[in-house]
Amino acid sequence: HGFAACDGGDKDRIRLMEAANLGIVTAYNDMLSAHQPYRDYPDKIKTAARELACTAQVAGGVPAMCDGVTQGMPGMELSLFSRDVIAQATAVALSHQMFDAVVCLGICDKIVPGLLIGALHFGHLPMMFLPAGPMPSGLPNSEKARVRQLYAEGKVGRAELLEEMPPYQGGGEMIERVSFERTTWN
């Protein structure tokens, strides 16, 4: 079962143990903007592995939450606990003894330690943590500071302040178009 879903070339390489097989553990989800680059990473990693005559498989996904999204909500109580769940999910993903190395995809002070703790259950495997890079806010800091200062002085209202923090990198039903320059709303 460990390679049944692979395409023909990868399936044969894994079955015959002809090449290294990388396990990918990902924290990608559609909700967290910082994770949006990870959507395409598994396919890119698989392509790069094939170019090196190796294979790569997504071993599993781990839950990912953001304190910024759950602040003031009951879910915030789960933030630190999530690290242990992520560690367990990572260990389960790697437990099939199919992999020669592991690539962990995740960002956050709970997610990365959870990935590390789980991957260390298989400490014999070389592991790599691949960051998605900095999370730009879509507005320059000078513009954010300007709007916040005007709000503090009472010169702009709540609506203008909220415009300073539009969603970015990904969208939802309420968003018409997102770019790093501007977000337009439905």
Protein language model features and the residues they cover:
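Residues at the starts of beta-strands that form the adenosine-phosphate
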Residues: 21, 55, 126
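Glycine-rich phosphate/diphosphate-binding loops and the adjacent beta-loop-alpha structural elements
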Residues: 20-33, 175-185
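An N-terminal, well-structured beta->alpha segment
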Residues: 1-20, 34-37
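Active-site cavity-forming subdomains of large catalytic enzyme subunits
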Residues: 76-186
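Glycine-rich oxoanion-binding loops at beta->alpha junctions
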Residues: 1-10, 55-104
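Gly/Ser/Thr-rich loops at beta-strand to alpha-helix junctions
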Residues: 28-35, 63, 106-113
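Glycine-rich phosphate/diphosphate-binding loop of Rossmann-like nucleotide-binding domains
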Residues: 12, 29-58, 66
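Flexible, glycine/charged-enriched surface loops at secondary-structure junctions
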Residues: 12-16, 53-61, 158-162
